Amino acid sequence: MCNGGGHLTNKLIELGFNVKATDLVYRGSGIGGIDFLKQTEIFDGDILTNPPYKYALEFVEKALQLINVGNKVIMFLKLQFLEGQERRRLFDTMQLKKVYVFSKRQQCAKNGVFIGSSAVAYAWFVWEKGYHNLPQLEWI
């Protein structure tokens, strides 16, 4: 899901991971025409993506619905995803296991092109279905 140009996908494949890459729009990598938010089939694995921020909550909730207990949802999100009353109910489920905060501001590419610097703080958020403890915060 949200495969985009395949930058994350290609790196994961290079590292030896078994990857299923989809996106709503085909951009030269993976399978296009797949609306992740309409998926119903349980996925036996972990889900990793960089979702559109305005739909991030919906992507996290859908991903947690689609995986088995013990599997993970890993999302590259703005650090400010931690804020907000609407997202609070998601965090109350206690399935957020780790947040890896980037020590250095990350530059995000649009269509594979990096432009300028970033004023936005990002983090990798890791949920584990069935995890019932406080989340851990780490820096990378």
Which role does the model predict for each range below?
Residues 1-140:
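Class I S-adenosyl-L-methionine-dependent methyltransferase catalytic core
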